[in-house]
UniProtKB/Swiss-Prot annotation:
Cellular compartments per GO CC: cytoplasm
Principal place of residence: cytoplasm
SUPFAM superfamilies: Cytidine deaminase-like
Keywords: Cytoplasm, Molybdenum cofactor biosynthesis
Gene field: fdhD
Protein name, as recorded: Sulfur carrier protein FdhD
Organism annotation: Listeria monocytogenes serovar 1/2a (strain ATCC BAA-679 / EGD-e)
A single BP term in Gene Ontology: Mo-molybdopterin cofactor biosynthetic process
């Protein structure tokens, strides 16, 4: 299935209109069924769909990981993903989208907005991953080189899982959560540890993206954009390093300073 379509448009430039062909990101609704029960419809980019399903179900706490999944059958023609699972957390499946505010890590600040997030996120333990600024600049350069669809359409989000030296997985999607779920799903299926890895993200680091990073088990997130105040507060409490505004030869470290040298 094509992830990009080509549309005739009228562009205004230098005082005149001209008709050109423009690349546009494809939008694809995927409905996930777990043991023949409809769970959710995700609007996504139609590639790496099995990775998306596995990553989504695990990050939302519906399953504990690939060991709970017998099979994933993607039916592209109808937009269905049929999952056979030997274990399903029915509580998280039922209350996945219920708004719920609780204090983070036993502190008084109210940070989590969904019940499943509060139960699935733990304080990140100090790992052995540390990054120098030179490493970060090199990783961001490689990340940009892997962002062809973003530059072509301007309509997708990019995410990557990386070590200190290289990008391991790179995924893009029209949904920012989806891009991270695709990475998580691939890492889970490959048995790739995320504890000593970092996330690179193309957009701003919102509290939702910070929670996704925590669910993946990564201790560092890097972005060309900035984090929000709530994301920084959560990062401090969850012991996650946030680095933003990585542009040219400068960057800002907002939390977890000890991991960046």
């Amino acid at each position: 299935m094509d992830i990009v379509s080509h549309q005739k448009i009228r562009r205004f430039e230098a005082g005149t209109f001209q008709e050109i062909e423009s690349s546009v990101a494809t939008e694809y609704p995927l409905t996930i069924y777990v043991n023949d029960q409809e769970l959710v419809t995700i609007v996504c980019t139609p590639e790496y769909l099995e990775d998306l399903v596995v990553g989504f179900l695990t990050s939302e706490g519906i399953v504990r990981g690939p060991r709970d999944i017998n099979s994933v059958d993607i039916i592209e023609a109808t937009g269905h993903a049929k999952v056979s699972a030997n274990f399903v957390n029915k509580f998280n499946a039922k209350y996945r989208g219920k708004r719920y505010i609780t204090s983070c890590c036993g502190k008084s600040r109210e940070n989590f907005y969904f019940q499943s997030d509060a139960s699935l996120v733990n304080v990140k333990q100090n790992g052995n991953l540390q990054l120098t600024t030179d490493m970060i600049f090199r990783l961001m350069e490689k990340f940009e080189q892997n962002s062809a669809t973003f530059h072509q359409t301007g309509g997708v989000h990019n995410a990557a899982l990386c070590s200190s030296a290289e990008i391991i997985y790179s995924r893009m999607d029209i949904g920012r959560h989806n891009a991270l779920d695709k990475i998580y799903g691939r890492a889970l299926q490959d048995g790739t540890s995320t504890e000593d890895k970092a996330i690179i993200f193309s957009g701003r680091i919102s509290s939702e993206i910070l929670v996704k990073t925590a669910k993946l088990g990564c201790g560092i997130i890097l972005s060309r954009s900035a984090p929000t105040e709530l994301a920084i507060n959560m990062a401090e409490e969850l012991n996650i390093t946030t680095v933003g505004f990585i542009r040219g030869d400068r960057l800002n470290v907002y939390s977890g300073f000890e991991r960046i040298t």
